[in-house]
Regions:
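Bacterial Sec-dependent N-terminal signal peptides
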Residues: 1-22
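Short coil/turn segments at secondary-structure boundaries
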Residues: 3, 93-94, 115
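Residue-level preference for the first positions of well-ordered beta-strands
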Residues: 25, 114-118
């Protein structure tokens, strides 16, 4: 009987670990914004930006997202709206001033799920770091809109960051093949 118990214990541990899933956090910067009025702190998207928002929806169409987060700006909301409508999700607003607390909330509320975050050039990489990942690139410039980051947090807490692109390529974007991330 003791041997049977040990046998079941040994072979059930890997099964129970496999049943638990990694958490996936997808991060993008908002799509192209109107820049004709430098005094406008909350601009809309350009036509190219609206197209990129549709491209984001296409990129994530097979993913079962549990939640979509964005900052309280028109450009982030408009970037997220097409995918939110397709997935029948209500966009949740987050405060980019406290990314550590936001990352903790994501990991606590969405363990084993898939999350989309639409942020800004000065918050996306910082959010990756707050989630425990390493920056795969040093910075996102003002004219780069096509980066798509995936942060996978395993059940054991290991963090893996990958990046690529979506939609039309931004000229100055670093190729995902030019930089490897551990």
């Amino acid at each position: 009987m003791k041997n049977l118990f040990i046998f079941l214990l040994i072979f059930n541990i890997p099964i129970s670990l496999k049943a638990q899933k990694s958490t996936f956090v997808y991060l993008v910067r908002h799509a192209e914004k109107v820049v004709t009025d430098p005094t406008n702190k909350d601009p809309l998207l350009t036509e190219q930006g609206h197209q990129r928002a549709l491209n984001l929806g296409e990129k994530l169409k097979k993913q079962k997202l549990s939640v979509i987060y964005c900052t309280d700006y028109q450009r982030t909301k408009l970037t997220a709206e097409p995918i939110a409508e397709k997935k029948n999700l209500i966009i949740q607003i987050y405060d980019p001033k406290n990314l550590k607390a936001f990352a903790e909330k994501i990991l606590e509320d969405n363990k084993g799920k898939k999350v989309l975050i639409v942020g800004h050039s000065n918050t996306v990489l910082e959010t990756i770091e707050a989630l425990g990942g390493k920056r795969p690139i040093t910075t996102i410039s003002d004219n780069e809109y096509d980066y798509f980051f995936t942060v996978e947090i395993s059940v054991a807490g290991l963090v893996n960051v990958k990046f690529g692109h979506y939609g039309d390529k931004t000229e100055s974007s670093v190729s995902s093949y030019e930089m490897k991330v551990n």
